[in-house]
């Protein structure tokens, strides 16, 4: 049996402000840093260890991983920073307040933009300063692969090559893998692992800073999965994530 641990980054500054974030590189709040440290403590208490870590190229996920590694005394393990694990690109919604956007366009439209499988938000213009074409962290990414907007289907399409070419082979070689990433890149992985339908994925939310443990068979099919931590607090966190895109 193999184990895989997925962790969404701790609360970010724009999570706190209820803004669409996507590829904008915001940092953790103090609460987010504490969530990440607690995740590391829970993993250590559960007797888990890791041989390799994957994260995105965005600091909220990177710093979350740092805190987890620090709590587990695993700062020395190899880390792969992969743009394919970035959050879904929210296009022209990046930086907008979710509740204000819902008040303007309606809860239903914002739910579609946030959670539908194949409907992307309005795209950025290529000349928009929020576009990532000139960002040095994407210097080796083909321009046509740098998005101006994404739906979850697009996110799945960029995450899966990394899974197939790197993450899955690492797991099957016996390496213990932890992935610190983002709500939608983790939803993409969970959709694949649990074979969730395009319709049902709309209802899946991922809480901040909470280790999600998968136990996998020899073919990397899930035997079971579970969150580490206080289950009531996790349920409250999931409910809070679900309500972010509603008008107030």
Swiss-Prot record:
This is 2,3-bisphosphoglycerate-dependent phosphoglycerate mutase. Signal peptide: none annotated. The gene is gpmA. Its EC number is 5.4.2.11. The active site is at 9 (tele-phosphohistidine intermediate), 87 (proton donor/acceptor). Residues 127-137 have a biased composition (Basic and acidic residues). The keyword Ribosomal protein does not apply. It is an enzyme of class 5 (isomerase). Catalyzes the interconversion of 2-phosphoglycerate and 3-phosphoglycerate. The record marks 182 as: Transition state stabilizer. Gene3D superfamilies: Phosphoglycerate mutase-like. GO terms for biological process: gluconeogenesis; glycolytic process. Residues 117-137 are annotated as: Disordered.
């Amino acid at each position: 049996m193999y184990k895989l641990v997925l962790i969404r980054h701790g609360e970010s500054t724009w999570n706190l402000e209820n803004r669409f974030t996507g590829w904008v590189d915001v940092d953790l709040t103090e609460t987010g840093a504490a969530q990440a440290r607690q995740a590391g403590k829970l993993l250590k208490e559960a007797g888990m260890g890791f041989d390799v870590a994957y994260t995105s190229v965005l600091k909220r996920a990177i710093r979350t991983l740092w805190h987890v590694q620090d709590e587990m005394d695993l700062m020395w393990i190899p880390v792969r920073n992969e743009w394919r694990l970035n959050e879904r690109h929210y296009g022209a919604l990046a930086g907008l307040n979710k509740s204000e956007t819902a008040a303007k366009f309606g809860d239903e439209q914002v739910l579609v933009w946030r959670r539908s499988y194949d409907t992307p938000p309005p795209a950025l213009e290529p000349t928009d300063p929020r576009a990532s074409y000139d960002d040095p962290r994407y210097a080796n990414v083909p321009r046509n692969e740098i998005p101006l907007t994404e739906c979850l289907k697009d996110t799945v399409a960029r995450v899966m090559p990394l899974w197939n070419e790197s993450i899955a082979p690492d797991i099957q070689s016996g390496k213990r893998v932890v992935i610190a990433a983002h709500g939608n890149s983790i939803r993409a992985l969970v959709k694949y692992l649990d074979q969730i339908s395009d319709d049902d994925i709309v209802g899946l939310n991922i809480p901040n800073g909470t280790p999600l443990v998968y136990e996998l068979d020899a073919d990397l099919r899930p035997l079971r999965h579970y969150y580490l931590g206080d289950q009531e607090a996790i349920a409250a966190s999931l409910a809070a994530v679900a309500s972010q895109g509603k008008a107030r």
